[in-house]
Amino acid sequence: MIIEARNIRKSFGSLEVLKGVDIAIDRGEIVSIVGTSGAGKTTLLQILGTLDRADSGELRIDGTDIMGMNNRKQAEFRNRRLGFIFQFHRLLPEFTALENVMIPALIAGKSRKEASCEAERLLSDLNLSDRASHKPSELSGGEKQRIAVARALVNHPAIILADEPSGSLDSAHKEELHALFFRLCREMGQTFLIVTHDEKLAAGTDRILHMRDGLLFSE
């Protein structure tokens, strides 16, 4: 198992959002989590991605005990091993597409030359080489989200965590992005965990998990 979590609990004040969640994901799987708004999907994704801490429970990612790490160690692990794609691209407006993709690699300690070469390779693979010098304001919605995908991939993460990744796109760009996810999983062997309301995207994944009342169900 590349992700294994047991009895994950999380409360905000008196509101218990996660009530003892168990989840296990194999390497190379694409798994979707669906459910109504407020069911706890994003909270769970943030905990699995080390962006937030559970109140209690166990979490191992690729054999590493995450709960025992301090914040600095978690941040280092996150930048090396995990990639994130959000509904809104979160590109830095003052930087070019190429520079946005390079940022996680630079944070990981790679040289500027190495980061640039890898970012250029990814942009080429995603048919975005001609947009490398453009800033986010000069890109379409679909292009910005593909730049965000390249940024998520630049450190060769074992796992990609995506929260409503196509929620802000039109139908044509959604189809394009979904096809890209499946291609990456097939060609690069990466594991994808996707929170989505998009029934078509969920239907194409290896497994669909349903979140209800703070718990996960496989149906």
Curated annotation (Swiss-Prot):
Part of the ABC transporter complex LolCDE involved in the translocation of mature outer membrane-directed lipoproteins, from the inner membrane to the periplasmic chaperone, LolA. Responsible for the formation of the LolA-lipoprotein complex in an ATP-dependent manner. It comes from the Bacteria. It is an enzyme of class 7 (translocase). ATP binds at G35, T36, S37, G38, A39, G40, K41, T42. The gene is lolD. Its EC number is 7.6.2.-. The keyword Nucleotidyltransferase does not apply. The complex is composed of two ATP-binding proteins (LolD) and two transmembrane proteins (LolC and LolE). GO terms for molecular function: ATP binding; ATP hydrolysis activity. It is found in: Cell inner membrane. PANTHER family: ALPHA-D-RIBOSE 1-METHYLPHOSPHONATE 5-TRIPHOSPHATE SYNTHASE SUBUNIT PHNL, LIPOPROTEIN-RELEASING SYSTEM ATP-BINDING PROTEIN LOLD. Belongs to the ABC transporter superfamily. Lipoprotein translocase (TC 3.A.1.125) family. Pfam families: ABC_tran. PROSITE patterns: ABC_TRANSPORTER_1, ABC_TRANSPORTER_2, LOLD. Its main location: membrane. InterPro entries: AAA+_ATPase, ABC_transporter-like_ATP-bd, ABC_transporter-like_CS, MacB-like_ATP-bd, P-loop_NTPase. This is Lipoprotein-releasing system ATP-binding protein LolD. It is a peripheral membrane protein. Residues 3-219 form the ABC transporter domain. Keywords: ATP-binding, Cell inner membrane, Cell membrane, Membrane, Nucleotide-binding, Translocase, Transport. One of its GO terms (cellular component) is plasma membrane. SUPFAM superfamilies: P-loop containing nucleoside triphosphate hydrolases.
